[in-house]
Structures are given as C-alpha cells and as structure tokens.
Amino acid sequence: MRKEWLWVGIASVLLSACIDQPPAPQQQVQQTYSGPVEEIGGAEPRYEPFNPNVNQDYKVNGQSYRIIKDPQNFSQIGLASSYGEEARGNTTATGEIFDPNALTAAHPTLPIPSYVRVTNVSNGRQIVVRVNDRGPYTPGRVIDLSRAAADRLNISNNTKVKIDFINVAPDGSLSGPGMVGTTIAKQSYALPSRPDLTSSGMGTPMQQDAPATGAAVQAIDNSQLSGTDATQPVASQSSGFLRAPTPVPAGVLESSEPVIDSAPVTPPVVANPGPVTTTPTSSAISGGYVVQVGALSDAQRAQSWQQSLSQRFGVPGKVSNSGSIYRVQLGPFSHRQQAVDLQQRLSNEAQQQSFIVAAP
C-alpha cells in the first residue's frame, strides 16, 4: 500500500512540474513582401511623438470617437472628402494653421500627428499625407484631405480610398501597411503647384549650354538621382502613381534640341525638327530640371515605359537606377517652366502624376 502511495506521489510531482512549466513561445514567422516595389511622393514621414492633448477619446454631435492606441496594422477603406480655401487659416487639432496647399489630412481616430498612405481605389494613384487634424464627421466619410492632396489623387465626391498607416520609429525607419510594396521619394522641397496655362504657352523645350543664372532652384536630395545619360531619352516619372500611360497625341513639346540663334560657325551638331537623337552637351545635362514620372523595381519595364513616353511626347529621357529602384525621368530642360509645361501635359493627356527635380 505504501508503495502505491509512493508511486502516486511521484506521479503527482512529475505532473505538477509539467503543468507549472510554461509552454515554449512559438516564434512568429514574419511574412516578407516579394512583389513589385513602387516609389510614391507626398509628405516625407518624420518621427513625431504623438500629442497627448489631442489623442484622448472625445464626442462630437452625440457620437463617441475612440482614439486608436495601436495603429501599427491599421488600414481602412471608405469615401474621402476634401477641404480647401474655405478652411484656410483655421487652426488644426495640432495647433497649426491649415494650409490647403500642404499635403495634410484629417482623421477622426488616428493618433496625431501621424502619416498614412492614401490610395485612390479607382485609378491607383497614391500619396503620403500627414494627419494633423480631426474629422470628417460626415457619415460614410473616412478621411478629409487637403485640396493639394485631393487634386493629386484626382478625388471626387464619390471617390473611394484606402488608408494605410505608416509607422515612423524614433530612428526614422518606416514600417506598417503603408510601406508594403512602397518606397517614399525623399525630397526636401514642396511639390510644384499647378501651372497657370494662361500666363505662357507651352513652347518647345530648349537645351542650352548652361541654365540661366539666378534661376530659383529649390533644394532637393540629389543622393537618389544618378547622373543624367544624355544618350538615352529621359522618361518623366509620376512617382509610380499609375501603371503604363495611355498613348497621347503629338503635342507642343516635340523635341529638346538646342536653338541656334543666327549663324553658328562650328556645326558638328545640327538642329533638326525631329526628335533629338544626338548627344547633348555635358553642360546641358549638368544643370536644369527633369520631370520624374515613376519608379519601378523592374529595369526592363522602366526602360520600355521611358521609351514610350519619350516617343509620344517628343522629349528625351532616361532611366536612373538607385539600387533596385529604376526611376523614369524626362528631360533635362534648361528652364523650369518647360518642365512644368510637360508635367501639365502628362496630367491632362495621360492622367499621369509627376514631380520636378533638379538635374544632376
């Protein structure tokens, strides 16, 4: 009998030891994204601590809103609205003065300030905006975009968008659903405003030996732009907002050949009315502006896209690569207005977004 109790005691001890020992934690396998990566523009995410004064649960018109405490995996689909000049000068939830030309947005429950990638579901255009205000409070609306952001996404009253949160770590690293398949163009300048077509015509772009002195060249981050190869046409990049553009009719920007004033003496380079196939001078490439249309992770697709754009718009172009990212650029142009004119044509005729950068 004692032996039986002894065995029962031993079994109990062993059983309790098994129960008290916590199970070994299962290591979660992080799924990596292996699809295409596209570069998009917009507000450049920077680390900003959440403002505790504007991140408390609140109530508006009898409706309670609970602030999302952990938005690391936040995504949302719904209708977007926009606000512009009618709200200029108003104070946002962060205490900033609202500027309709800034790439900002209002969201009812996301932490402030934060950054999100907004995608127009109907046309695929994407942009990064900074959330610095509360709203909208209209049923069915999930985000309120500034006029500048809405214009670049081509938002209407019935446009459905997808919101993906971008987490910015203190060291500046980016993660979250807003970074899946995306790289963000680093830029230290404001995106160009829409050109005034009534002020000047869209003339043929001219490549001069050197850009005009005193031209207002806005500061940019040139570390991501490689030297311009004049022997290849430069495709205008729309920062990957759209897929390959549709054919466009021949327009005003037919060539980028240099203009010869009167009677040149040394004529190795002859200006012809057709598209330029000769190599521009190194001084023309080393200054001026290019229009960046998009960035792809496939070199062959980027080259094909660039050649198609160069042929249809009658401008030179090239594909500039940085690591595994291939940027499609058009130009260079000696005057910024020429780049603005081409940018407007890309938007109107090909529904293609783009931005202007200084040529290396």
Swiss-Prot record:
Enzyme Commission number, as recorded: 4.2.2.-
N-palmitoyl cysteine lipid attachment residues: C18
Alphabetic keyword roster: Cell membrane, Cell wall biogenesis/degradation, Lipoprotein, Lyase, Membrane, Palmitate, Signal
InterPro entries referenced in this protein's UniProt entry, alphabetically: RlpA (IPR034718), RlpA-like_DPBB (IPR009009), RlpA-like_sf (IPR036908), RplA (IPR012997), SPOR-like_dom (IPR007730), SPOR-like_sf (IPR036680)
A GO CC annotation given for this chain: plasma membrane
Keyword Cell wall biogenesis/degradation attributed: yes
An annotated Gene Ontology molecular function: lytic endotransglycosylase activity
Any single biological process term in GO: peptidoglycan metabolic process
Localization annotation: Cell membrane
Membrane topology of this protein: Lipid-anchor
Endpoints of the signal sequence: 1-17
Pfam families linked to this entry: DPBB_1 (PF03330), SPOR (PF05036)
The protein's role, per its UniProt record: Lytic transglycosylase with a strong preference for naked glycan strands that lack stem peptides.
Matching NCBIfam families: PRK10672.1, rlpA
Protein name stated in the entry: Endolytic peptidoglycan transglycosylase RlpA
Organism this protein belongs to: Yersinia pestis
Taxonomic lineage: Bacteria, Pseudomonadati, Pseudomonadota, Gammaproteobacteria, Enterobacterales
